[in-house]
Structures are given as C-alpha cells and as structure tokens.
C-alpha cells in the first residue's frame, strides 16, 4: 500500500489498474471499515477506470491516533483532500458505501467540487443533506429498486453503478423504475434472458440467469415467452428492477 500523511499521521491507499487508464474512481468504505472491505465491487467496473481503495485513520493499515473516532465524515473528507494532493489526482469519481462512505463523499464534494467528476451514493435510501443546488448534477444515486437485500450484494451494486456510468437509465412504462437491458435467446418454449454485450460483466457468466434464479418476479417466465415469437432468434428486452416487468418495445418506455 502507498502512504500519505494527514496531520502527522499515516493514511494508506492502494491503486489498481493504474496503467493505461483514463479515469480515476475512489471507493470510500463505510465507517470503521478498511479499504479492502469494498474490493469485491471492483470487478464490475469498466476497465478504463483506475480504482483506488483508501484506509482512513483508525482503519486498516492507517494509524489510529489516541482517542480518534473513525466516523468523522468531515475529517475523512479532509483526508481525501490530502490523498488528492499526495497522489496527484486532478479529478475523480467517488463511490460511497454505507452511510459513512456516502457522507464522506458528500462532504468532499462540498469542499472541493472542482476535483469531483461524479459522486455515486450506494447506501439504500441515502439523501444528501448539505449540498448546494448547483452541485446536484454531479450526484448519482443508486435507486432502492436496484438494490436487492443483503449487506454485501456487490453484484447488483456493481451492475447498477456500471449502468449509471454508461448513462443507460431506460425507465419502466409501468412503474417508472430503472430497467436493465438484455437479450432474449432460444425459442418460445425455452427462452432465456441475459445481459447484452453492451453491459456484460466480464467474469460473471449468465448474469441474467442469476437474476431470474434469485429474484424472479411473479409471472416473469410467462411474460418472457409471450414476448418471444416461435422462431429461434435474439431479441433485445428490458427487465425492470422494481416491478419485474419485461418489455421489448422501446417506443413505449418513459
């Protein structure tokens, strides 16, 4: 791990994919967590991003000053400021995890907005509290409808984050939720929905089947077969994270 100093104490960070990448993404863990606690998220992020994990004071390999409380969000934002100077980052995307990581990212955005390209809040039902209106266009929040139960559901968070980064926010015509684009393959009697090549996650086979197997909405397979005609072919289709509805008619999407 690399080191930088904040008020005379050692903080640490690790860089991944540092060669040949054009953008920097800093992953900010929840209160009291080391940077490695969010490393499972990294495999879902496009390869053009350099990924940075941070150990704030009191966490991981960083120093723990006497009496230091590790959930001081404003203080952690100041540690991020020192990281930017030490590592030479001109601008980065911040991804906050949990309430603490999101509050730290929010505080840094308010302090140094010129250094932030985007902030992605992953905590469920998270609402920014201290951002002026002019900074809100930099904020991206993963909707509750895109988050499945489970504290460490990196797969769904990664998919949602990737979709937001690509600007693909197709809306469900039934409930307004965000839909995931995929392909129907097979035949009417044996239809299968999988993520299409545009948002395929390397190293995660049959992600669409994972979705169906673990989060199959009522009547989903029947809707899938109705959408598919009798001939064997490939069709683009969208699945709503919120209500589970499936559609192939882009013109009707809102």
List where the protein language model places each region:
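Alpha/beta-hydrolase fold catalytic core
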Residues: 1-25, 48-49, 89, 155-165
